[in-house]
């Protein structure tokens, strides 16, 4: 009898900020911490925030954040920007990493930004992809993502919202993400993260304008022009406020820049991080 196949989203377990944390840790060199998005259609782990090839040139760490994927869910069921940032710092501490580059996707971008503001000594460079981090009126797409209730039809509709190129959305992907969304405990914790009114979730993940304007880090801001989850204006604002920011907008692209323009995305991020490697070598 064959042993049950382990999900590729399961890596190894560490204790971070007191919580059992699933993460993938691969490659060697200067570390990059990847922080995934929040939507049920956004896979954590190696296929989530920033599926780029930097593991060939650097150490890449991709944890499931508190309450997501195969990481522990807090007993009190309470989530906040501050708690997730504490968990991310706990990951760095558990791995003995004093400083790293932070790559944040969507929800994860808001956490990456807040982490850099609260713990500037822990961050070298920032990459913010389709990121929250400033306040904006919640979009219908984000309302749908955060209000998701498990069904295959709902997952298919959600995937269609994420991707500009609908050919990327097939039955296999919808089934895979749907199955992940019906794992025991998933829906209870997800509903607790972003309860209505969900505008509060956007505002909780936003950082203060004064703090953003004081951010010293070189920052790459990336967005899809046709993004229906996080408005392009959020990244335009971040690029205006962050002193050392550069902005790249992908045309013909929704909320999945790292998937819809995978090759260009990989080169863009790797070149940005490699520039810092060269400066500090």
UniProtKB/Swiss-Prot annotation:
Keywords: Aromatic hydrocarbons catabolism, Hydrolase, Plasmid, Serine esterase. It comes from the Bacteria. One of its GO terms (biological process) is benzoate catabolic process via hydroxylation. Optimum pH is 7-7.5. InterPro entries: AB_hydrolase_1, AB_hydrolase_fold, AB_hydrolase_sf. Residues 30-55 are annotated as: Disordered. The keyword Hydrolase applies. Pathway: Aromatic compound metabolism; benzoate degradation via hydroxylation. It is an enzyme of class 3 (hydrolase). GO terms for cellular component: membrane. The keyword Thylakoid does not apply. It catalyses: (2Z,4E)-2-hydroxy-6-oxohexa-2,4-dienoate + H2O = 2-oxopent-4-enoate + formate + H(+). Residues 31-261 form the AB hydrolase-1 domain. Catalyzes the conversion of 2-hydroxymuconate semialdehyde to 2-hydroxypent-2,4-dienoate. Belongs to the DmpD/TodF/XylF esterase family. PANTHER family: AB HYDROLASE SUPERFAMILY PROTEIN YCLE (PTHR43798:SF31), MONOACYLGLYCEROL LIPASE (PTHR43798). This is 2-hydroxymuconate semialdehyde hydrolase. It comes from Pseudomonas putida.
């Amino acid at each position: 009898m064959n042993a049950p196949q382990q999900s590729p989203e399961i890596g190894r377990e560490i204790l971070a900020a007191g919580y059992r944390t699933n993460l993938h840790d691969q490659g060697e060199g200067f570390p990059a911490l990847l922080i995934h998005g929040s939507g049920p259609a956004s896979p954590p782990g190696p296929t989530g925030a920033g599926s780029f090839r930097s593991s060939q040139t650097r150490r890449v760490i991709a944890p499931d954040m508190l309450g997501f994927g195969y990481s522990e869910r807090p007993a009190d069921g309470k989530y906040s920007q501050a708690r997730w940032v504490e968990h991310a710092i706990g990951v760095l501490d558990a791995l003995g990493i004093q400083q790293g580059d932070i790559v944040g996707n969507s929800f994860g971008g808001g956490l990456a930004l807040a982490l850099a503001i609260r713990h500037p000594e822990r961050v070298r460079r920032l990459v913010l992809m389709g990121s929250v981090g400033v306040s904006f009126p919640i979009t219908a797409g984000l309302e749908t993502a955060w209000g998701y209730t498990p069904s295959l039809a709902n997952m298919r509709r959600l995937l269609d919202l994420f991707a500009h190129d609908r050919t990327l959305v097939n039955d296999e992907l919808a089934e895979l993400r749907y199955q992940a969304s019906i794992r025991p405990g998933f829906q209870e914790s997800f509903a607790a993260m972003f309860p209505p009114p969900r505008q509060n979730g956007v505002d909780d993940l936003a950082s203060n304008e004064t703090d953003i304007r004081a951010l010293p880090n070189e920052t790459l801001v990336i967005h899809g022009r046709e993004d229906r989850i996080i408005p392009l204006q959020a990244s335009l604002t971040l690029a205006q406020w962050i002193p050392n920011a550069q902005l790249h907008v992908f045309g013909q692209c929704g909320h999945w820049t790292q998937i819809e323009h995978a090759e260009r995305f990989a080169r863009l991020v790797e070149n940005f991080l490699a520039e810092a490697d060269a400066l500090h070598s």
